């Protein structure tokens, strides 16, 4: 009994609180997708992602990672990478990169009237002709769940919120 209490005290330190917040950050379907990704990387199915798992996964994608590269990736984790740590690391990355205002400002460059909307046809043209060009099929996929009103206005402020926090629950 006393050893269980000692273990319980050990697990209640800061990392445990951080991970519980991470689970609250994602909805159940997102967690399931992360679990599937974790299982694909965990090649030896031991419940942990190690250097060999990373190497095998990257090799299966046609990459030939160096030991230094793999070590750098492994060193981003403060300890063994189980699913909870994996989710925590993704949560930190998702929160730490491309803040909402950066995404919003990227869209705002094409919203001369500062309305929060871009005409869907204009956005399609931009996405298929500039930068890393989308195919029409990719734009169709984007628009399937995008906040577009009946007048064809793409609500990029709401879209940015969806990107960062997920879609609002709907009863299917």
Swiss-Prot record:
<feature type="modified residue" description="N-acetylserine">
    <location>
        <position position="2"/>
    </location>
</feature>
<feature type="binding site">
    <location>
        <position position="53"/>
    </location>
    <ligand>
        <name>Ca(2+)</name>
    </ligand>
</feature>
<dbReference type="InterPro" id="IPR002048">
    <property type="entry name" value="EF_hand_dom"/>
</dbReference>
<dbReference type="InterPro" id="IPR018247">
    <property type="entry name" value="EF_Hand_1_Ca_BS"/>
</dbReference>
<dbReference type="InterPro" id="IPR050403">
    <property type="entry name" value="Myosin_RLC"/>
</dbReference>
<keyword id="KW-0677">Repeat</keyword>
<dbReference type="Pfam" id="PF13499">
    <property type="entry name" value="EF-hand_7"/>
</dbReference>
<keyword id="KW-0007">Acetylation</keyword>
<feature type="domain" description="EF-hand 3">
    <location>
        <begin position="134"/>
        <end position="169"/>
    </location>
</feature>
<feature type="modified residue" description="Phosphothreonine; by MLCK">
    <location>
        <position position="19"/>
    </location>
</feature>
<keyword id="KW-0597">Phosphoprotein</keyword>
<comment type="subunit">
    <text>Myosin is a hexamer of 2 heavy chains and 4 light chains.</text>
</comment>
<dbReference type="GO" id="GO:0016460">
    <property type="term" value="C:myosin II complex"/>
</dbReference>
<keyword id="KW-0106">Calcium</keyword>
<feature type="binding site">
    <location>
        <position position="46"/>
    </location>
    <ligand>
        <name>Ca(2+)</name>
    </ligand>
</feature>
<dbReference type="GO" id="GO:0032036">
    <property type="term" value="F:myosin heavy chain binding"/>
</dbReference>
<keyword id="KW-0518">Myosin</keyword>
<keyword id="KW-0514">Muscle protein</keyword>
<feature type="binding site">
    <location>
        <position position="42"/>
    </location>
    <ligand>
        <name>Ca(2+)</name>
    </ligand>
</feature>
<dbReference type="GO" id="GO:0005737">
    <property type="term" value="C:cytoplasm"/>
</dbReference>
<feature type="binding site">
    <location>
        <position position="44"/>
    </location>
    <ligand>
        <name>Ca(2+)</name>
    </ligand>
</feature>
<keyword id="KW-0479">Metal-binding</keyword>
<keyword id="KW-0505">Motor protein</keyword>
<dbReference type="InterPro" id="IPR011992">
    <property type="entry name" value="EF-hand-dom_pair"/>
</dbReference>
<feature type="domain" description="EF-hand 1">
    <location>
        <begin position="29"/>
        <end position="64"/>
    </location>
</feature>
<protein>
    <recommendedName>
        <fullName>Myosin regulatory light chain 2, smooth muscle minor isoform</fullName>
    </recommendedName>
</protein>
<comment type="function">
    <text>Myosin regulatory subunit that plays an important role in regulation of both smooth muscle and nonmuscle cell contractile activity. Implicated in cytokinesis, receptor capping, and cell locomotion.</text>
</comment>
<feature type="domain" description="EF-hand 2">
    <location>
        <begin position="98"/>
        <end position="133"/>
    </location>
</feature>
<dbReference type="GO" id="GO:0005509">
    <property type="term" value="F:calcium ion binding"/>
</dbReference>
<feature type="modified residue" description="Phosphoserine; by MLCK">
    <location>
        <position position="20"/>
    </location>
</feature>
């Amino acid at each position: 009994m006393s050893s269980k209490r000692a273990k319980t005290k050990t697990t209640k330190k800061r990392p445990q609180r951080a991970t519980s917040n991470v689970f609250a950050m994602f909805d159940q379907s997102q967690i399931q997708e992360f679990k599937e990704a974790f299982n694909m990387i965990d090649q030896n199915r031991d419940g942990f992602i190690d250097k060999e798992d990373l190497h095998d996964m990257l090799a299966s994608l046609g990459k030939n990672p160096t030991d230094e590269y793999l070590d750098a990736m492994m060193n981003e984790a403060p300890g063994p990478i189980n699913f909870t740590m994996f989710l925590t690391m993704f949560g930190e990355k998702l929160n730490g990169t491309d803040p909402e205002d950066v995404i919003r400002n990227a869209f705002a460059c094409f919203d001369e009237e500062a309305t929060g909307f871009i005409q869907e046809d204009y956005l399609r043209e931009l996405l298929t002709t500039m930068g890393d060009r989308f195919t029409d099929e990719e734009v169709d996929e984007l628009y399937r769940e995008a906040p577009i009103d009946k007048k064809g206005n793409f609500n990029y402020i709401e879209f940015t919120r969806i990107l960062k926090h997920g879609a609002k629950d709907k009863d299917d």
